[in-house]
């Protein structure tokens, strides 16, 4: 049949076909299929999938596709990436879904970074690390060798680790290389904290000292405690140093002058931790940006005003038992929003805005875990034998790692958690 005659015939057939009922159309198609050969059936098979299974992700505007993708969980999105190159391209380009996925894993999101592939890679890296945690393959160990006596004090900041020892020295290490950056002669160190220029040490000789890294010289000596100084913190902005001691006292010092500004009393046990931190929420007694002074002993956490008033009164005392039947572990976490401390019953988390207990996370599998670090998604805990990682969303222990042999300190100074930006 000539092409022109065929087109005329096809037009007539089409008009007639459109006039049929659905049942008649179906019978017509069945009859045509029965008359078709292999070439026609293959053609039908190839085109039916396109006609019946529309690729909505390909056909929809990109904005609508992104809106639909936001309803899927990350694991489903990764599966969808395997459907086709087009699906992988669209899904990988949706910045918001990958940022949200990273945020749900506890990642700090920089909204200025809008590279979708960057956030997808971050998520995949985090998932791999989660798998490594579950398989106990996420840790590496290294040793820093240099002290000749017990190491009693640790502090980590920006990839640098400071160690204070009974050998009357403090050393600053580059964690990534294992190299000692500075080594200076000090007194016995029970607590250390440092920045680029200086080192502050609390000592078993009942004093606090400030040292210059570059020269090793002692630039300030703070005398006044009658017991070992177990914890120190300072603020250059306020020009204030605070210290907690075995004499049950917290002292506030002028950092540059070395003079004692105030002595805060009220503790009836060793003060094992002091924290000087900016408030990030509006509380009953503070506003965002205000500096907060916290101190902790075996049973209580106290919140103090930062001032020079004599006989200064504690603003608030937090505890987990009124009869002192439950002890607090010596470590304390405060990020400006929440106070977290461990006890024999589990982790206690207080809301700093109201001072109410938000939750108690119990660890029935392992008792008496000490707190090492507390984040948005994970917490680091340890006992005499293992380091544990807890998923705070499920309140379950997801991994553990054997610790080297050590003598547990009543001050909780045996271990610390490092921090990485982002």
UniProtKB/Swiss-Prot annotation:
Self-association and partners: Directly interacts with SKP1 and CUL1.
Function as written in the Swiss-Prot or TrEMBL entry: Substrate-recognition component of the SCF (SKP1-CUL1-F-box protein)-type E3 ubiquitin ligase complex.
Domain of life per record: Eukaryota
Modified residues (N6-acetyllysine): 298
Gene Ontology CC terms, in alphabetical order: cytoplasm
SMART domains reported for this sequence: FBOX, WD40
Keyword Metal-binding in annotation: no
WD repeat segments: 146-183, 185-221, 224-265, 276-314
Limits of the F-box domain: 54-101
Database matches in CDD domains: F-box_FBXW2
Tissue expression profile of the protein: Widely expressed during embryogenesis and in adult tissues.
Protein's UniProt name: F-box/WD repeat-containing protein 2
Disulphide linkage map: none
Species of the source: Mus musculus (Mouse)
Keywords recorded for this protein, A-Z: Acetylation, Repeat, Ubl conjugation pathway, WD repeat
InterPro entries: F-box-like_dom_sf, F-box_dom, FBXW2, G-protein_beta_WD-40_rep, WD40/YVTN_repeat-like_dom_sf, WD40_repeat_CS, WD40_repeat_dom_sf, WD40_rpt
